[in-house]
């Protein structure tokens, strides 16, 4: 199926073929675990779930229709079949994604944090 890879190391956005396996996602985005960020209700970006903890990590910002999000490491855009929950070919074009991605400069970082709030 058609997917779009956001390659932070080479600062490229390109179409790739996804074989609908978890191993292929791990390989394409170079990770051990992943998280999924919905970007428009029809497409999602798969990213390294441990990306914030990698040293010398590179980042990109995706400017969606309503908001932007800064993400660590490579991203893989796949479509979503809302009825079944399955991944499908993305509905976006490479050009559309190129126009929505900005690669952040070397040295940019996000410090992961967690805050516990007492409920009263």
Question: How should each PLM-predicted stretch be described?
Answer:
Residues 1-120:
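Domain-length accessory/inserted modules outside core catalytic folds
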